[in-house]
Amino acid sequence: SSEAAPEEKVAILGA
């Protein structure tokens, strides 16, 4: 997503 939702950030940062 362009504007990463909290859960998406977790997926990105927690990759």
Curated annotation (Swiss-Prot):
Q: Which GO terms describe its cellular component?
A: mitochondrial matrix
In the record, what terms sit under GO molecular function? L-malate dehydrogenase (NAD+) activity
| Localization per Swiss-Prot or TrEMBL | Mitochondrion matrix
Leader sequence range is none
Q: Which GO terms describe its biological process?
A: tricarboxylic acid cycle
Q: Which UniProt keywords apply?
A: Mitochondrion, NAD, Oxidoreductase, Tricarboxylic acid cycle
Which organism encodes this protein? Nicotiana tabacum (Common tobacco)
Query: Any idea what this protein is called?
Result: Malate dehydrogenase, mitochondrial
Reported EC number(s) for this entry are 1.1.1.37
* Family membership noted in the UniProt record: Belongs to the LDH/MDH superfamily. MDH type 1 family.
Q: Subunit info?
A: Homodimer.
The enzyme class is: oxidoreductase
Catalytic reactions of this protein: (S)-malate + NAD(+) = oxaloacetate + NADH + H(+)
Residue ranges of the TM segments: none
